[in-house]
């Protein structure tokens, strides 16, 4: 799984949006720091950046009538199986949240979606 370019979040079909929530939850929990070719870049940033991205996903889910567990809205929460962070510095959201989400990454994401039969 990959983290879709954040500009695509409002356009993602249901399955991809909900998949992003699962991916973010896994990465914020026990998956933090575990190598995975398509998401390794998130580990070079503060976990707070991933929280900010996940917050965008949850906001879009709520716009569509889904109700993600409110526990995930806590930036220190890491899931039921992992102890929460004690603290980490809050950061101002940048656009894009992850600098890696540039125009080339957007094109890569669009091609990936196209290969799945999803035209945005």
Annotate each language-model stretch with its function:
Residues 1-120:
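Expand to "…catalyze enediolate/carbanion chemistry for C-C bond making/breaking, isomerization
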């Amino acid at each position: 799984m990959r983290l879709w370019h954040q500009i695509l979040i409002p356009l993602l079909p249901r399955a991809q949006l909900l998949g992003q929530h699962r991916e973010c939850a896994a990465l914020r929990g026990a998956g933090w720091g575990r190598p995975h070719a398509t998401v390794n870049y998130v580990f070079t940033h503060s976990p707070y950046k991933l929280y900010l991205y996940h917050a965008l996903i949850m906001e879009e889910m709520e716009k569509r009538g889904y109700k993600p567990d409110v526990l995930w809205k806590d930036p220190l929460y890491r899931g039921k199986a992992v102890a929460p962070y004690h603290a980490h510095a809050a950061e101002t959201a940048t656009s894009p949240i992850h600098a890696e989400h540039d125009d080339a990454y957007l094109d890569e994401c669009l091609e990936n979606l196209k290969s799945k039969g999803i035209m945005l």
